[in-house]
Amino acid sequence: MTFGRVALLVGVAVLVLVANVAASILYMVVYSYVIDPGHDPQYYNDHIQAAAPYCSIVAGIPLMFGAGFWVAGWWRRALGVRAAWIVWLAYVLIDLAVLLVAGMSMAVALLFGVSFGTKLAAAHFGARLRLARPAEPAAAATSAQL
């Protein structure tokens, strides 16, 4: 795998990370305006600290599944699942670096371990689903005629 390909996959990991953070922000907006309005900002800051790992798990599974599905079709079949794993690995390294700098408790570390595991499974199964599907119906019809 070339450096350019890995750079593209790291870019996908960053997109997934940004989308996951956006999902947490959206959750917090809905929570603060609809579910439990009327508190001071510190209340909501404390709440998102507790809720963020769960948001990461819930939103991260479909995001990473989609990323795995997407990148598995970029190059030949042999690189499909490997590309999804590289996206996951880049995501984990970036997210883990941020968490270590921010300082996390053991409970949060356990939840993020679960989050990383579910994301790996999602990326893997997304790539496997993409590879299990026929490439293009027109190509299959052409090869059947030969």
Regions found by a protein language model. Give the residues of each.
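Juxtamembrane/disordered regions of integral membrane proteins
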Residues: M1-L146
